[in-house]
């Protein structure tokens, strides 16, 4: 009897315990369902950014949203977002209210792929607080930049921001500095690209300025330190946003931006094409594309492209298109310092950097702006192991007080320094004039050019015949005869060739074949330089 009672008591306790367990399980399941619902709600909220009304306003401005831009830039389905649930930490000025909390804050960050190649990206969301930068916003950007440096992958920033978030005060300024530091740390390690797709003002402008390439969208993007209202109050100048910091200003006058595109879609599609020229990092080679353009292809039209009259202009871009693969050339800064041409192309499938003087503009003279433009490009190519092809037709440095007062000596030295410092394969082709110090600067043999060619039309000399005759034959009765004598002796490729300053005098039609062959040989080039902390380029 007693045993039966004990069994009954144990059974009762077990029944109570089981009931409690069932209740606990139901509670846990309910909690899990609640958490999952919250997660999904947060995701839906994050995907909407600042809400449908603000998305509609963004579209009315002719602009895509932050997420639409990422979707168009990256391969379909490749985007892996990070920090979607991050929110700002500001509690002042009513910012702690739920209505002022947006999952992801005002920037979308993550990684994805462009034509199968890894890239990290951040896209500022103008629909959330005007894309303004908070401490959390900066933290998200810094996190993906750190990851990109660690794994060796490029960073692309899609900028559309009203500036620092005033409510956060100095924390926003600290956030900018954190980003700037990473821009500098990543420089020369991974490619960094900025695409300005809206406003970018105040301290925000320095991050794009520190990146390797800055592109803009016409009519909707602006870059300036201080806006029109501040300019008016300080200098009494009346200027519009477009005039002060629009795409035209920065691609034609300041040189801050490298190219401008018609709209968001055009910009993002071109950015995908541009990305294909670049290596993932300084430790990786540039991608090699299958080439259907024969490497030994002759270009007969080049034999007559240089005019017989040395003062007559021609278009160096035509020469570049003729020798590169499939005539494809992605020019950088095409509307700034037009007397020098820089850009990317492929030779037998390999990415190469092209530098060339433009006889159509200022006779191809080097000046302050062209020297800085060329130097910056050469240094990028050298940092990322991209071979350099240089086409030379340069009568010298542009004379005048404006150039001298502006510091042409220092700025011209930048281009010289960049070519001398570069250890990548360097092939130089002198098509016509190579006069004076400008001859030395343009990737000459004396600056460790690997292969230096001259066309039969090349004139390699201290200066042009007219100027030389006025000095050498001053007071000579027959000036024309003296000039002819000088041309015969010096204004041709032979004086340089007999001294080994050019490796060969080639027929222009064979230029592509010779360059492709040289690049094959130079692919294994290695150069050891003395150790130093860093160089001191004449800034």
From Swiss-Prot:
Impact when changing residue 165 to W: In PA-2; no effect on affinity for propionyl-CoA; decreased reaction kinetics for the propionyl-CoA carboxylase activity; decreased thermostability affecting holoenzyme oligomerization
Cellular component per GO, a single term: mitochondrial matrix
Description of how the protein assembles with itself and partners: The holoenzyme is a dodecamer composed of 6 PCCA/alpha subunits and 6 PCCB/beta subunits.
Domain observations: The beta subunit contains the carboxyl transferase (CT) domain.
Gene Ontology biological process terms, A to Z: branched-chain amino acid metabolic process; fatty acid metabolic process; short-chain fatty acid catabolic process
Family note: Belongs to the AccD/PCCB family.
Catalysed reaction, written as an equation: propanoyl-CoA + hydrogencarbonate + ATP = (S)-methylmalonyl-CoA + ADP + phosphate + H(+); butanoyl-CoA + hydrogencarbonate + ATP = (2S)-ethylmalonyl-CoA + ADP + phosphate + H(+)
Chief place where the protein resides: mitochondrion
Cited function: This is one of the 2 subunits of the biotin-dependent propionyl-CoA carboxylase (PCC), a mitochondrial enzyme involved in the catabolism of odd chain fatty acids, branched-chain amino acids isoleucine, threonine, methionine, and valine and other metabolites. Propionyl-CoA carboxylase catalyzes the carboxylation of propionyl-CoA/propanoyl-CoA to D-methylmalonyl-CoA/(S)-methylmalonyl-CoA.
Acyl-CoA binding: region residues: 325-358
Superkingdom of this protein's organism: Eukaryota
One matching Pfam family: Carboxyl_trans
InterPro entries per the UniProt record, alphabetical: AccD/PCCB (IPR051047), AcCoA_carboxyl_beta (IPR034733), ClpP/crotonase-like_dom_sf (IPR029045), COA_CT_C (IPR011763), COA_CT_N (IPR011762)
Post-translational modification N6-succinyllysine, affected residues: 99, 248, 474, 489
Annotated spans, Carboxyltransferase: 32-533
Impact noted for substituting residue 536 to D: In PA-2; affects heteromeric and homomeric assembly
Organism the protein comes from: Homo sapiens
Record flagged with keyword Transit peptide: yes
Protein name: Propionyl-CoA carboxylase beta chain, mitochondrial
EC number, as in UniProt: 6.4.1.3
